[in-house]
Curated annotation (Swiss-Prot):
Cholesterol binds at Q96. The OSBP-related domain (ORD) mediates binding of sterols and phospholipids. It displays an incomplete beta-barrel containing a central hydrophobic tunnel that can accommodate a single lipid molecule with a flexible lid covering the tunnel entrance. The ORD can bind two membranes simultaneously. It has at least two membrane-binding surfaces; one near the mouth of the lipid-binding pocket and a distal site that can bind a second membrane. This is Oxysterol-binding protein homolog 5. Keywords: Lipid biosynthesis, Lipid metabolism, Membrane, Phosphoprotein, Steroid biosynthesis, Steroid metabolism, Sterol biosynthesis, Sterol metabolism, Vacuole. Its main location: membrane. 20-hydroxycholesterol binds at Q96. The modification Phosphoserine is found at S389. A 1,2-diacyl-sn-glycero-3-phospho-(1D-myo-inositol 4-phosphate) binds at residues 24-29, 109-112, 143-144, 335, 339, 343. It comes from the Eukaryota. 25-hydroxycholesterol binds at Q96. Belongs to the OSBP family. It comes from Saccharomyces cerevisiae (strain ATCC 204508 / S288c) (Baker's yeast).
C-alpha cells in the first residue's frame, strides 16, 4: 500500500466518498489523487493512431479486400469498412482507459475543466504525407453538469469524428466506483456515418489505493449502410476471466443482432492487448488487433507561452506543476485560486443576466420542445436521428447506449439536448490557433 493510502488523508477520503449522497462527479477530490491533466485532453485519445483512424476512408469498391488481411474473401466494401472502424475503435480504448495507470502506476482523477476551457492541437503526419493533417478541438461546454465536447477532422481524407461526454458516478457497497457515460460519438467517413455509444465502466482497487478501470456493459457501432457491431465488455472475476475482455459481433442489420448466430464475425480478446477474429461458419481464427504493435502518435500542442489563457495547459500550468512535484499545499492553493476566479466570473454573468457563449459547439434539441434561441432544432435528416432510429436507440438524455423501451428510457426524462460541432464557428475563430 502506498504512503498516501496509509495516511489519515486517504482514510478520510474513503469515509467521505462512502457516505456521500449524490453524483460523485460534483465531489472535490483530495490533491494526492489528482492527475496533472485536464479532462479536456482526453478527447485526443480518439485519434492517437492516425493510420487506423484514417484507414476506413482509404477503402473503396475496388481495393476493399486488400484492407482486410484477416479475411481475403470479405464480401463487400461495407463489411471491410465496418471491420476497419471496429479495429480503430478498439485501438482507442487502451489510451482512454489504461494509459494513465500505465504511466502513473494507478488511475488518477483528471482535473475538472472550467466552463469555456479549450484544448487544441494537430497531428501533422509528416512521415505519411498521404494522411494529411488532423485537427483536434475540445471545449468544456458545461460545468454543472460537467460536459466536454470535441471535434477531430481530417479534410484531406474527408474523415471526422465528433461527440461529447458527461458522466454520473456512484459507489457500490464494496467501494467500487461505477461510472455511467452520457453522450455519444459520430464518425463520418466520406458518404458513410457511424454512431458510436460508449460503455459504462467501474473503477476498482480503491480500497488498496491502486485504482484501475474496467469496462462493462456494451457499445454499439451503427452504420448508415445498416451494418451494426455490438461490443460486450467484461472483466476478471474472482475465479475466471481476464481483465479488459470483450466480444464484438458484426451484423448486416440491427434486426439480426437479437440472435448471436447471425453474426458475420466474432472478434474477441483483450482490448488492452491482443484480439482475434473468426468468420461465421469458420473454425480458423486470425489476429485482429495487437495494441503493443501500434504505438500512439502524440498530438502536437503549442508551447504554453503561446497558448490562449483559456487553453488547458496554460490555465492549469501552476496546478499541474504542483501535482508533479507532489506539493500538497501548493496544489490546494493554486487550484483554489483558479476555481475561485471562475466562480467570480460566473457570478458576474449572473448579475449581468448573460450566459457564457460557447466557442465551437451548439446544442441541438431532438424533441424540438426547447424555445431557447441558443438551441437548434434537429432536422428530419439529422445523422444522429436517422442512425438512432435504425438502432432503436433513445435520443433522450439518458446513459449512452440506452435502447427505446429500456429501463432508463422509461424514466421521466423530458430532454433530448445534444452538443454538435459547428465548423463555421471554428472558421470565424480569431483568438485561438492550432
Amino acid at each position: 500500500m502506498s504512503q498516501h493510502a496509509s495516511s489519515s488523508s486517504w482514510t478520510s477520503f474513503l469515509k467521505s466518498i462512502s457516505s456521500f449522497n449524490g453524483d460523485l462527479s460534483s465531489l472535490s477530490a483530495p490533491p494526492f489523487i489528482l492527475s496533472p491533466t485536464s479532462l479536456t485532453e482526453f478527447s485526443q485519445y480518439w485519434a492517437e493512431h492516425p493510420a487506423l483512424f484514417l484507414e476506413p476512408s482509404l477503402i473503396d469498391g475496388e481495393n476493399y479486400k486488400d484492407h482486410c488481411p484477416f479475411d481475403p474473401n470479405v464480401e463487400s466494401k461495407e463489411v471491410a469498412q465496418m471491420l476497419a472502424v471496429v479495429r480503430w475503435f478498439i485501438s482507442t480504448l487502451r489510451s482512454q482507459y489504461c494509459s494513465r495507470s500505465e504511466s502513473m502506476g494507478s488511475e488518477k482523477k483528471p482535473l475538472n475543466p472550467f466552463l469555456g476551457e479549450v484544448f487544441v492541437g494537430k497531428w501533422k503526419n509528416d512521415e505519411h504525407p498521404e494522411f494529411g493533417e488532423t485537427v483536434l478541438l475540445s471545449e468544456q461546454v458545461s460545468h454543472h453538469p460537467p460536459m466536454t465536447a470535441f471535434s477531430i477532422f481530417n479534410e484531406k481524407n474527408d474523415v471526422s469524428v465528433q461527440g461529447y461526454n458527461q458522466i454520473k458516478t456512484g459507489f457500490t457497497k464494496t467501494l467500487t466506483l461505477t461510472v455511467k457515460p452520457y453522450g455519444h460519438v459520430i464518425l463520418k467517413i466520406k458518404d458513410e456515418t457511424y454512431l458510436i455509444t460508449t460503455p459504462p465502466l467501474h473503477i476498482e482497487g480503491i480500497l488498496v489505493a491502486s485504482p484501475f478501470v474496467e469496462l462493462g456493459g456494451r457499445s454499439f457501432i451503427q452504420s448508415s449502410n445498416g451494418m451494426l457491431c455490438v461490443i460486450e465488455f467484461s472483466g476478471r472475476g474472482y475465479f475466471t476471466g481476464k481483465k479488459n475482455s470483450f466480444k464484438a459481433r458484426i451484423y448486416r442489420s440491427p434486426q439480426e443482432h437479437s440472435h448471436k448466430e447471425n453474426a458475420l464475425y466474432l472478434i474477441s480478446g483483450q482490448w488492452s492487448g491482443v484480439s482475434t477474429i473468426i468468420k461465421k461458419d469458420s473454425q480458423v481464427s486470425h489476429q485482429f488487433y495487437d495494441s503493443s504493435e501500434t504505438p500512439t502518435e502524440h498530438l502536437l500542442v503549442k508551447p504554453i507561452e503561446e497558448q490562449h489563457p483559456l487553453e488547458s495547459r496554460r490555465a492549469w500550468k501552476d496546478v499541474a506543476e504542483a501535482i508533479r512535484q507532489g506539493n500538497i499545499s501548493m496544489i490546494k492553493k493554486t487550484k483554489e485560486e483558479l476555481e475561485n476566479k471562475q466562480r467570480a466570473l460566473r457570478e458576474q454573468e449572473r448579475v449581468k443576466g448573460v450566459e457564457w457563449q460557447r466557442r465551437w459547439f451548439k446544442q441541438v434539441d431532438y424533441m424540438n420542445e426547447n424555445t431557447s434561441n441558443d438551441v437548434e432544432k434537429a432536422s428530419e435528416d439529422d445523422a444522429f436521428r436517422k442512425l438512432a432510429s435504425k438502432l432503436q436507440l433513445s435520443v433522450k438524455n439518458v446513459p449512452s447506449g440506452t435502447l427505446i423501451g429500456g429501463k432508463d428510457d422509461k424514466k421521466d426524462v423530458s430532454t433530448a439536448l445534444h452538443w454538435r460541432f459547428d465548423k463555421n464557428l471554428w472558421m470565424r475563430e480569431n483568438e485561438i490557433t492550432i
